[in-house]
């Protein structure tokens, strides 16, 4: 009987005792369990990062992908216009302005205009040219669908369609319609748009400095099979500083940059 009573009392004490020692011990065990679980989760996350690109890389890829998706958006600075991809005949940028730069001709003319984002960058480029004693003038900026049709038809009648295709864009396929392009020249070549401009001091300076202000030489030498057009050292296209520098650094073209 005493033995039975002893066990009953012992059991009562074990169940009801609120000893701090027991409480701390159980809490510690619980914390250790949580730490172990957290460590396991962290280990799993680290393993996932090893197996897959980091979130930062994924975000960068997504950012570039979104920009590249915009090649079909006429208002995007990376819009791609070439022989395969064109613009709607009715597309006219709404933010065309005349940049504050010298031109090869006087008077008010639509071809003096470009989009405001490109105009601001062009003004800075020309200001730097003046600072470096480099003479540059604007020759031809924005060109409407209808105006491009007139130019192409004239060249086709003069030299034939095949020849015209090498240096003149068909209507809807001219970068000038984007409002992001400007042809430039200098007195060294009598303000003409000729390949010799690329060999002048002004042409070499332009090729080097244009990317610093967001422009690329859109049709570089040796890339005719990619761009579809002959070398045009005078043809500037605005794409933004970051993109322009990358394209220039890789000696690339807009086509390669967008689809590589």
Model-identified regions with their sequence ranges:
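Extracytoplasmic cell-surface/polysaccharide-interacting catalytic and binding patches
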Residues: 19-141, 145-260
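Sec-dependent N-terminal signal peptides of Gram-positive bacterial secreted proteins and lipoproteins
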Residues: 1-26
């Amino acid at each position: 009987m005493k033995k039975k009573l002893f066990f009953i009392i012992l059991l009562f004490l074990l169940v009801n005792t609120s000893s701090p020692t027991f409480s701390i011990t159980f809490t510690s065990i619980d914390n250790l369990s949580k730490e172990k679980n957290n460590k396991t989760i962290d280990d799993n996350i680290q393993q996932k990062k090893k197996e897959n690109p980091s979130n930062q890389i994924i975000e960068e890829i997504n950012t570039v992908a979104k920009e590249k998706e915009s090649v079909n958006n006429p208002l995007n600075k990376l819009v791609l216009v070439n022989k395969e991809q064109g613009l709607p005949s009715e597309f006219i940028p709404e933010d065309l302005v005349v940049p504050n730069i010298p031109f090869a001709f006087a008077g008010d003319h639509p071809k003096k205009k470009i989009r405001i984002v490109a105009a601001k960058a062009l003004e800075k480029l020309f200001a730097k040219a003046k600072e470096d004693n480099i003479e540059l003038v604007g020759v031809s900026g924005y060109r409407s669908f209808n105006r491009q049709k007139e130019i192409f038809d004239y060249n086709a009648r003069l030299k034939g369609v095949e020849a015209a295709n090498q240096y003149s864009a068909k209507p809807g396929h001219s970068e000038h319609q984007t409002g992001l392009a400007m042809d430039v020249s200098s007195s060294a070549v009598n303000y003409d748009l000729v390949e010799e401009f690329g060999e002048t001091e002004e042409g070499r300076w332009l090729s080097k400095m244009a990317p610093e202000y967001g422009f690329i030489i859109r049709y570089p030498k040796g890339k005719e099979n990619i761009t579809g057009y002959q070398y045009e050292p005078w043809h500037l296209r605005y794409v933004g500083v970051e993109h322009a520098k990358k394209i220039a650094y890789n000696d690339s073209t807009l086509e390669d940059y967008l689809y590589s």
